[in-house]
Amino acid sequence: MAAGASKGDVVDDFELLDETGTARRLSEFLANGPVVLFFYPAAMTRGCTVESCHFRDLAAEFAEVGAQRVGISRDSVAKQRQFSDMHGFDYPLLSDPDGAVADRLGVRRSLPLGPLSTKRMTFVIDTDRHILEVIHSELSMNDHADRALRVLRARASR
């Protein structure tokens, strides 16, 4: 996939380790319904915690529209596990340590900022791998889950 994935683009399948060290594929998630793939810069930082906890707190709403939430950052498997355990996340956190998936979707910042090289972006991906929506917001952490739900509710009402 070219840099800067947009609404309507098809997301290529990928495989990354989750917080338990289990290899997970995008296609595996999509087999069970649409996916909300949210990129966050760094586990255990204030903004990323607010965003990730909001996704956790809306579990019932995402279940109502048959969608799965999947977090992703450049953090190690061990740090993702610590982050998940600390906040009781009920969804997988994927480790993209070299930023390969972030690069494919255009989520890498142009300036090298070490662990903060990943932008805060969310992709709502339909079961056919087409992107339904791309959500950009570095400062409004709750917008990611809230807007993803609006898109998924509109999809469900079609």
Name the predicted role of every residue range:
Residues M1-R158:
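Chalcogenol-based redox active-site neighborhoods
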